[in-house]
Amino acid sequence: MNEDQFPKAYDPKSSESGVYSFWERSGMFIADANSKKPAYSIVMPPPNVTGILHMGHALVNTLQDMLIRYKRMKGFEVCWVPGTDHAGIATQTVVERHLRSSLGKRRTDFSREEFLKHVWEWKEKSQNVILSQLRQLGCSCDWSRQRFTMDPEANRAVKKAFKVLFDKGVIYRGYYLVNWDPILQTALADDEVEYEEREGWLYYIRYPVVNSEEFITVATTRPETLLGDTAIAVSPEDERYSHLIGAKVIVPFVDREIPIIGDFSVDASFGTGAVKITPAHDKDDYRTGMNHRLPMINILTPTGEINENGGIFTGLAKESARENIITSLEALGLFVRKEAYSSRVGVSYRSGAIIEPYLSKQWFVSVDSFRESLREFVNSKEINLFPPEFIRNYLTWVNNLKDWCISRQLWWGHRIPVWHNKHDEEYVICFDGDGVPEEVAQDPESWYQDPDVLDTWFSSGLWPLTCFGWPEESADLRKFYPTSVLVTGHDILFFWVTRMVLMCSAMVDTKPFADVFLHGLIFGKSYKQYDDNGEWTYVSGDQKREYDKGKALPKNVVAKWEKLSKSKGNVIDPIEMIDMYGADAVRFTLCSCANRGEQIDLDYRLFEEYKNFVNKLWNGARFIFGHISELTSRDLEEGVNKDLLGLEDFYILDRFNELLALIDSHYNCYSFDKIAALAYDFFKNDLCSTYLEIIKPTLFGKQGNDEQRATKRKLLATLLVNILGVLHPIVPYITETLFQKIKTTLGVVGDGLGDAVTGHAVSMLRSEACMIAGYPQPIELSFPQGLRESFAIAEKLVYTIRNIRGEMQLDPRDLLQAFIISSEKKELLDACIPIMCALGGIKTIEQLSEAPKDCIFSLGVVEGIQVGVILPAEHLAKEHARLEKEKIRLENSIESLSKLLASEDFRTRANPNLVQAKEDALRNSRQELQSILDKIASL
């Protein structure tokens, strides 16, 4: 075998693009909606067209590709639909930032159409990069079915869904308190708001009671909102204020008289027991305002400034207004004090702006009619959540679900398909066709389309349907919907997963998927480096990489696992990793740590480890090729002579069957990390470190005959083909490369079927490619009774021999002689001898009835079986001298420690921990000395 046929080192860059082109060119990714095979389908969680793939995308798409490749090889008609998401807020924000930096212009400097042209250009560039990166990763998507959440098909589906819900009265519009992002100037849904604990102040303010000398004092975290106060509330049971219920107070600066009301929701122990009610700017106050029919006065502009209702403070940013109001209250004698106070503050998940409860006219989806079906899908196990620990989270969220605000004040997105009459705001037309409604076409001057767009999650909620052509009754929809599984991160269980269940079931009255696998979120190691002043910066780049790989940390550097963040320097670029280590190493790394919903700790060390495994796979296959290159496919078609199979052969075949059973069970419950661990362990330990080492003497002609050697070679070829099939879903590139080399080496497969051992390998080799070959099947063979127990004894005997060699410090390169003594199990021990010789470094092993008298040996016992290693004569004196030297060292140590511990002065003055440590050292030295004396006696 020369270097051209099989290079010594695997080079991912030289093979990956060619392998992928071969798959795609051959049409192997394309699904057939008319196939009679059982369907297996996945719709890709569409990456946002905001930029490029990150490590989370690499993880989720690796896991999906594993499932798709596994099921394809299992005989399913698989359909994996790729796509991208328009990501309304995120993409518009990125493009606005790009236009400011490149052209020096803001969105409002363009017309809506002009701005959207720039967004579409951005989308095309970003999408092309993303799809190229998915190909690099090895994703076997059906690119002929590629989708975008704002393509014409998606737009038709969105308009249809809106019309269906609108006609049912589920979609409604009205003035409600929404989560307002003053930076992006749009409403957000409740689950788009993140909450942070922040330090602030509690301000105490006095309100003068009308026609009275009294004042009522309230405590508030937001004094600027007093401009919109419409009541003061107290508990009806609070005797301090019961006489004031029904009275009125004057709101400073705006001179508005507002009532003091009694409301049982007031916590009398908070602050002063009296609270200001601002229904237009606080959710709790909004409910109180609705219950008491209070006016709702909005005091803010969409940008977060005080509007015309703010009197002398009009035009000020709310932070400036707060300072000015406090100063003015002090001047009026109405400010009492402030005290430190921490509270949970809502923050926009996109812009980071503090969310402002804001009274605004928005479109909503009423969720009450969906709540029961959302619960039932999961409770009845029609939809299975993995891991099941998330079921409780899901049900809690559904039980507390509030109406969904679906309108966004953006330009990029699906325009709300509603037209308003300019003369009568309540007169609207919802239209899901192309163009405009007929009534609008006849009198366009009297109508305008709603300027808002739909929440991104509205269109994403229809994704499983739109990917297969809904609302058309397509062949794809009939074959591949509902989908088999959704793979995504647990962080969007509520953002997206539940909305898909809601939207899809509302449209077609069935679930969108059978299973949902929620993977954990990726964390990276961040390193804080402190200077002499205690200031710190994050370490990044090559320095971080070295620390990840195990370089010792200096005393001024502290490591911590944290969510991936550019600012923390712990982001790992998946494409950079592919360039450095190859796609297979990246995929194996991600698969190996893809636990069920827990934190995923990822660092460069793991990529190094699995790059080494990929190299091990290449080197192991190269070794096997060196011994099967003379075989032909006809040799495998003939099968193997089962009478020539040894204990080690039955064992490796049995282990392979066990591997298949375990891997199948783990695929069924999405335990990707366990699949990776099993495949890794079988190839590295069972096949290479154990089986190959056992049969090397036979392969190299040092034992056995030609027929036995031929049997081993057939087994090696069979095992290699099968393990490539098992590994293919995880590491598709190298397995395909090796599979093609085997096909080339063995030649065209004929009509022979092989036998129980080689049959499936022969069948696989008839396939054009590994990715469309049948998945390996259990080898139906009559295995010897007690096989596993027998091999376990062989392993224990090998372990004992290795222990003896280690204790006697025998050169591992020296082939020694050994013997075994047992009154029974002779046949078993005969079968164990080749294994013991190969793995224990033994030249010959004899079965004896008693220990030999004419040699020196070291003895061990395993389950009543004595195993002795005969020691070389020249080793005896050397080992005896070494043991005597060690004996003297230990005796001196014992004498020294004994004297120290006998000293009363030491025992009374020394730290008790030190005394205990010395006592432990004395005890250990005595035990070591006894062991040395025993060894000397045995010599």
UniProtKB/Swiss-Prot annotation:
<keyword id="KW-0436">Ligase</keyword>
<keyword id="KW-0547">Nucleotide-binding</keyword>
<dbReference type="InterPro" id="IPR002303">
    <property type="entry name" value="Valyl-tRNA_ligase"/>
</dbReference>
<keyword id="KW-0648">Protein biosynthesis</keyword>
<dbReference type="GO" id="GO:0006438">
    <property type="term" value="P:valyl-tRNA aminoacylation"/>
</dbReference>
<dbReference type="InterPro" id="IPR033705">
    <property type="entry name" value="Anticodon_Ia_Val"/>
</dbReference>
<dbReference type="InterPro" id="IPR001412">
    <property type="entry name" value="aa-tRNA-synth_I_CS"/>
</dbReference>
<dbReference type="Pfam" id="PF00133">
    <property type="entry name" value="tRNA-synt_1"/>
</dbReference>
<feature type="short sequence motif" description="'KMSKS' region">
    <location>
        <begin position="563"/>
        <end position="567"/>
    </location>
</feature>
<comment type="similarity">
    <text>Belongs to the class-I aminoacyl-tRNA synthetase family. ValS type 1 subfamily.</text>
</comment>
<feature type="binding site">
    <location>
        <position position="566"/>
    </location>
    <ligand>
        <name>ATP</name>
    </ligand>
</feature>
<dbReference type="InterPro" id="IPR037118">
    <property type="entry name" value="Val-tRNA_synth_C_sf"/>
</dbReference>
<dbReference type="GO" id="GO:0002161">
    <property type="term" value="F:aminoacyl-tRNA deacylase activity"/>
</dbReference>
<keyword id="KW-0030">Aminoacyl-tRNA synthetase</keyword>
<dbReference type="GO" id="GO:0004832">
    <property type="term" value="F:valine-tRNA ligase activity"/>
</dbReference>
<comment type="subunit">
    <text>Monomer.</text>
</comment>
<feature type="coiled-coil region">
    <location>
        <begin position="873"/>
        <end position="939"/>
    </location>
</feature>
<dbReference type="InterPro" id="IPR013155">
    <property type="entry name" value="M/V/L/I-tRNA-synth_anticd-bd"/>
</dbReference>
<keyword id="KW-0175">Coiled coil</keyword>
<dbReference type="InterPro" id="IPR010978">
    <property type="entry name" value="tRNA-bd_arm"/>
</dbReference>
<dbReference type="InterPro" id="IPR014729">
    <property type="entry name" value="Rossmann-like_a/b/a_fold"/>
</dbReference>
<dbReference type="Pfam" id="PF08264">
    <property type="entry name" value="Anticodon_1"/>
</dbReference>
<dbReference type="InterPro" id="IPR009080">
    <property type="entry name" value="tRNAsynth_Ia_anticodon-bd"/>
</dbReference>
<dbReference type="InterPro" id="IPR009008">
    <property type="entry name" value="Val/Leu/Ile-tRNA-synth_edit"/>
</dbReference>
<dbReference type="GO" id="GO:0005829">
    <property type="term" value="C:cytosol"/>
</dbReference>
<feature type="short sequence motif" description="'HIGH' region">
    <location>
        <begin position="47"/>
        <end position="57"/>
    </location>
</feature>
<dbReference type="GO" id="GO:0005524">
    <property type="term" value="F:ATP binding"/>
</dbReference>
<keyword id="KW-0067">ATP-binding</keyword>
<protein>
    <recommendedName>
        <fullName>Valine--tRNA ligase</fullName>
        <ecNumber>6.1.1.9</ecNumber>
    </recommendedName>
</protein>
<comment type="function">
    <text>Catalyzes the attachment of valine to tRNA(Val). As ValRS can inadvertently accommodate and process structurally similar amino acids such as threonine, to avoid such errors, it has a 'posttransfer' editing activity that hydrolyzes mischarged Thr-tRNA(Val) in a tRNA-dependent manner.</text>
</comment>
<keyword id="KW-0963">Cytoplasm</keyword>
<dbReference type="InterPro" id="IPR002300">
    <property type="entry name" value="aa-tRNA-synth_Ia"/>
</dbReference>
